[in-house]
Amino acid sequence: MPLKLSLKPGEKFVLNGAVVQNGDRRGVLVLQNKASVLREKDIMQPDQVTTPARHIYFPVMMMYLDEVGAEKFYEEFATRLNEFMGVVRNPVVLQDCIAISKHVMAREYYKALMLSRKLIEYEDERLGHVSSGVSAGGDAG
């Protein structure tokens, strides 16, 4: 099933590791086969990895963007997820953590990434952090 991306003028996204930027008008991109696509709003820079949930999101994002080299990021992901689960008591959040782990084990990195975003939202609510680069919602896949 094709993936249709509606792009804002100048919007950047990563497509199979390449940074691509839309022109000066709105545009539509239709991907006919499987590809790793991540919109600019979903990309976290290393300097934005400042909280435990972001320490989970970042290696999942890297696994998604670099599936061939995913094992380089797995240990960091597993360590950080384990630490996070050790301090969280909310059963819904713990279920999300388990689901993230299952998605990563199945190499379903985009699904894991979108669930990881929920951890950031939970953390922001609890800790009162201002969002730092990863917005809620998303429509790339």
UniProtKB/Swiss-Prot annotation:
Highest taxon above the source species: Bacteria
Organism, scientific name: Caulobacter vibrioides (strain NA1000 / CB15N)
Gene that produces this protein: flbT
Any single GO BP term: mRNA catabolic process
Family the entry assigns: Belongs to the FlbT family.
HAMAP family: FlbT (MF_00783)
Designated name of the protein: Probable flagellum biosynthesis repressor protein FlbT
Role of this protein: Has a post-transcriptional repressor function in flagellum biogenesis. Associates with the 5'-UTR of fljK mRNA and promotes its degradation.
NCBIfam families membership: PRK00794.1-1 (NF001995)
GO MF annotation: an example: mRNA 5'-UTR binding
Keywords: Bacterial flagellum biogenesis, Repressor, RNA-binding
